[in-house]
């Protein structure tokens, strides 16, 4: 058995949309609160789907959070007495989030991040590959494909009911009006207008 020391670590919760990432983040943070640990939660300002100052899961569970525009803002908060730091929708931050999360863990914090591992095109989402590489614990969740009911690993973006084009902007904050969970077989990315003309 491993001997544990009072050092920090990084836990990453990832998967497609509707796989329960925020739900799992909230569950872990609440366990810390029940254990009388000091918990602080951050979320990106861009994610204002349900509430600006709370992490809210798709089924309505919520926890208070500090709204930040950049990862650097995390370091502006007094965290010396904090045991557990949660960060939701981590894919919306720039790559500097990786160094910040590592610094927090090195300073003895348990850091739990949650975010999409792939964008709507099925490609790695910004800082997630690096965060996965430096994490001690990784949980990859799956939703259920909205087409066939198989486990889903992808996020399907829909624009007016049609698959988004490959050259559409990467970030479009939305919920079930814009996205569906899909399996590999039913995940579709439409070609760009230029690609259509070349066909």
Curated annotation (Swiss-Prot):
Active-site residues, record numbering mapped to chain: 89 (proton acceptor)
InterPro entries recorded: P-loop_NTPase, Thymidine_kinase, Thymidine_kinase_CS
GO biological process: DNA biosynthetic process; thymidine metabolic process
One GO molecular-function entry: thymidine kinase activity
Gene Ontology cellular-component annotations: cytosol
Binding residues for ATP: 15-22, 88-91
Localisation: Cytoplasm
PANTHER family: THYMIDINE KINASE, THYMIDINE KINASE, CYTOSOLIC
Protein name: Thymidine kinase
Protein source organism: Staphylococcus epidermidis (strain ATCC 35984 / DSM 28319 / BCRC 17069 / CCUG 31568 / BM 3577 / RP62A)
